[in-house]
Amino acid sequence: RMKAGTADTVPFGFFKKSIFDTIGLFDERLVRAQDYEFNRRIIKSGGTVWLNPEIQVVYYNQPTLWLFLKKQLLHEAPYNAYMWYLAPYTFVFRHAVTGIFFLGILSGSILSFYFTWIKWLFFSVITLYTMLALIASIRQALRYKHIIHLFALPASFFLFHFLHGFGLVCGISKLLFGRAPVQKHDEPWEAAGRVRSFQVHNR
């Protein structure tokens, strides 16, 4: 069971009004990940983000797997890259794992034809990933008492990790080639003024 305590971010957080006067508003340049950037800004400024598992919310997810994956590919993943660009203090390694996964699958699939040691390394990593995905799927199948999880989740895990990684790499590529929809010189919110200096001086 999840315990109450400090966290690096929380979904649907409640904030004291005074915090907005101290560190500013949500960064409107970020279509996605606004809440994560704001929570990280709170921590960077010396504040605390507190997770209370007793608070319950009703969340309506995407109605189909395809819409969920499409959202990850076109919005969530690229905006992780844009967020790092605008606010480097938000970077954590776990958000980059899917990008590494995607590049590993892509490069491993190609290089395995030319190097034997890469073929065996690639095979070992894929085998480990498959085993971990199956273990997680078995746990969820037992938890929710639906055997369909045993078959659907491994494929869903792979599709999510691969497409999210692809979207992340695309976001980084757009930044490198100057085609990203975000710019540092744009105001993060209307009349950001002096508060905006936080993002400039806390990189």
Predicted regions, residues:
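Select subsegments of transmembrane alpha-helices in polytopic membrane proteins
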Residues: 91-99
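Short linear elements at protein peripheries
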Residues: 174-203
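Membrane-embedded multi-pass helical conduit in multi-pass membrane proteins
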Residues: 100-177
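Soluble, non-transmembrane catalytic domains of enzymes that act on hydrophobic metabolites at membranes
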Residues: 26, 31, 37, 41-44, ...
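Short, flexible, basic/aromatic active-site loop/helix in glycosyltransferases
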Residues: 1-12, 21, 81, 86
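Short, well-ordered alpha-helical scaffold segment located
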Residues: 18-22, 56
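Catalytic donor/gating beta->alpha subdomain of glycosyltransferases that bind UDP-sugars
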Residues: 27-91
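A cross-family signal for key residues in well-ordered alpha-helices
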Residues: 21, 40, 44, 103
